[in-house]
Amino acid sequence: MYNPEYDELYHYGIKRRSGRYPWGSGEQPYQHSTDFLARIDELKKSGMSEKEIAESFGLSTTQFRAQRSMAKDERRALQVATAKRLRDKEGMNNSEIGRKMGLNESTVRSLLNENSALKMNAAKTAAEIIRKAIDEKGIIDIGTGVERELNISREKLNEALAMLELEGYVVYGGGVQQATNPGQQTNLKVICPPGTEHKQIYDYANVNSLKEYVMETEEKQMKSLDPNFRVDKPSHFVYPASLDSKRLQIVYDEEGGTKKDGVIELRRGVKDLDLGESHYAQVRIMVDNKSYLKGMAIYSDDLPDGIDVRFNTNKAKGTPMEKVLKDIKPNPENPFGALIKEGGQSYWYDEKGKQHLSLINKRAEEGDWGEWSNNLPSQFLSKQNTSLIKRQLDIAKNDRQSEFDEICCWTNPTVKKKLLESFAEDCDSAAVHLKAAALPRQSYQVILPIPELKDTEIYAPNYRNGEKVALIRFPHGGTFEIPILTVNNKHKKAKSIIGNAKDAVGINSSVAERLSGADFDGDTVMVVPTNSRTKITSTPPLKGLEGFDPKKQYPYKEGMKVMKATGQQMGIISNLITDMNLKGASEDELARAVRHSMVVIDAEKHKLNYKQSEIDNDIAGLKERYQKSVDSEGNIHYGAGTLLSRAKSQVSVPKRKGNAWINEDTGALEWERINKKTGEKESKYVDETYVDKKTGKTVKRTQKSTKMYETSDARTLSTGHPKEELYADYANYMKSLANKARKEMISTGNLQQNKEAKEKYKKEAAELKAALNVALKNAPRERKAQLMANSVAKAIIADNPDITKKELKKLKTQALTKARLKVGANKQKIEITEKQWEAIQAGAISENRLKQILNNADIDKVREYATPKNRTVLSSAKIGKLKTMLNSGNYTTAEVAQALGISTSTVKKYM
């Protein structure tokens, strides 16, 4: 390259790139390093950006940085060697060495410092460690977080990788699908032995971690310290203990079993059947090592002698026990075909101190249901009056607007940008899911049977005695499925069974039947208090549903096809019912659709003949009338027919890669754009094809999205019905707010670190750095767990090509849980303290580090700090009164709340 300033011809050789002579050859060692760095300085002075400089050398920015680091290290190595020679061979002191080399004395001291030498050689040391691992194991994961395991910076790791690439090792990027999040992937970066092909990295069983992760359980750790240490719960799933059927009684339909269908009654005080701190739980209990019970477990005080478990069923008397119970699955990792919750198994100890596994395996327990999201699904609200719909959607809009206004007032730009990004994503999601603001004091509760209650009563300890509440079960067919009941918290029987339950209500079987045939095996309802301000429309039950029992009407027939895709089928019939409600279907038509939905929801679980139900109820005829549409080319389609059903309807779009661009003027997301600098068209779409195995045709690769996400105007999905228009207005408002948030985000500046704050909050900054290091060190372990889970999934699919998506999802979840436990993958959210938040606000943390902290912190906690709210903190006297009232057994949760002037949620916090 000709340099007119020096009138000499230079040729800048770059490692693994161009150059006539080997790297480091010539009269002066490392002269090419010096030339390379000098050229970078020249290009910088000419105004070129780092990216442009990298491109001028034919490198990516990552490769460029690695080459630059190597050049700097080699230049420094020359300086260190020179300084040492002058000191050791010529006897010069630091001052003399500095004058000789043209450096100041502090730089000389740094060159001769052994710690500095270690830092300089960090990349070489890392390269040696990685090389050894490749030689021993093969393909090695070198993705995010590995640099922390090596205790070096990412730049030093990239430098080490560049060194290894010079030796012929190859680096590839890729991805591993997240086991429990279809459509999402964990990025993969690996280094492989020379000659490895890119496709080989997708044999996940052969991708190894740099370090070996051996995880000791808490039990092993504690027992090593104390041999008498007692563990309450297994650290992972243990094959269940089995109940002797001699201890089990079945209560059949004729004996009252239907009134408590799905309830498992337990003898109180029996060690191997103890529910722990819960009054109730959704459980699985193995019986005789070949069958199992599933349902809601509660305590009972009237079991016959010799019986410890009583199961209620709607099956007729004379049905053999093995037909009442479920057969265990052949998979020892999942014998119940359902996932047991973390901590859902426990141990008990006999009089001699011997450990035994409890018979109880919990799917969910008291407190789990009350944590469900509180909002109003369109499936319910769209069937109510327009004034209620408008009110709740307007509240949701105002809540979002207030949140946006608050975020815009925040002064910390990094926090502001992070929360604006999160806010925009939430708004995009809100537009698709169409969920309105919750009604006052609504909550999700699990239902338990109290046969002695009247058809107009409910035992609901979290609501006021005497008030009226509406119950809504999902999937929701219409207003004819909504019972309005009066709270009776004085009912002695209910109080003895349920007590001050955190998230359960008691009803009788007639009420459950009206709720689209709900069972007492873990079914839930949304409870909404009704009054003059909150009027819920409830209409009489449909005559076509009276006495309808899907299990009796459509039992299994030999040779019939058993449903596998419950979620898909429920989506189809739910959309049909929604469209029928909006388009004014008759009661008879609605009854047909709802009867079929009742069959569908239990078809897989109870092997019901849903195909016959589809014929008997003429579902095809209902689709023809309420969902038929003709496109612009004259093609007939059946499916989602209104905005409410179309919003979440899937649509295939060209496959995309990476994140969308944000339009600077509008804030809208763009997958294609015209580059303002070059005028060239840029695209995030992936132009890939594959051969369809079924048709043999070559087709373009696509991905799934939703109709609402893909449209810029929700009204394109509406038929013009007033209720649809209310939801269209809401969706467009959310889309607009999301765009505003993104526009605000890209116009927000960067954080300027404050020197005084950095010094003042040195301790807090160090604490946050340490917490971040722990959080980021989990990344390689999580990748290893994902790789292991995917390897298991591949083997399962190979052995069971007909496995359902639902079953595969369960098995993947279980495989991932097990893998995480094995390698110790446990993402620990950074718990930011008030003092650390003070340091963040003062500018003691750099922009880049704060971004990383926020990505690994509890975002709700960050939001809480950034938006201080008045929190209810009770005095010790009030806490004492609260506990006294609860422990007396004479007051419900709602009555305690009323007496103390606080909410029931605050009472539950102190329970």
Task: Give residue ranges: language-model regions.
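Low-complexity, small/polar and acidic-rich linker and loop segments
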Residues: 1-5, 62-66, 76, 107
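Amphipathic alpha-helical packing elements
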Residues: 2-33, 502-535
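Short basic helix-loop element that most often maps to the first helix and adjoining turn
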Residues: 42-49, 87-92
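Short alpha-helical "recognition helix" segments of helix-turn-helix
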Residues: 52-55, 96-101, 146, 895-897
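Key DNA-contact positions within bacterial/archaeal DNA-binding proteins
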Residues: 62, 106-109, 155, 905
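Recognition helix of helix-turn-helix/homeodomain-like DNA-binding domains
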Residues: 65-73, 113-114
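Beta-strand-enriched accessory nucleic-acid recognition/scaffold domains that flank the catalytic cores
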Residues: 77-79, 84, 89, 118-497, ...
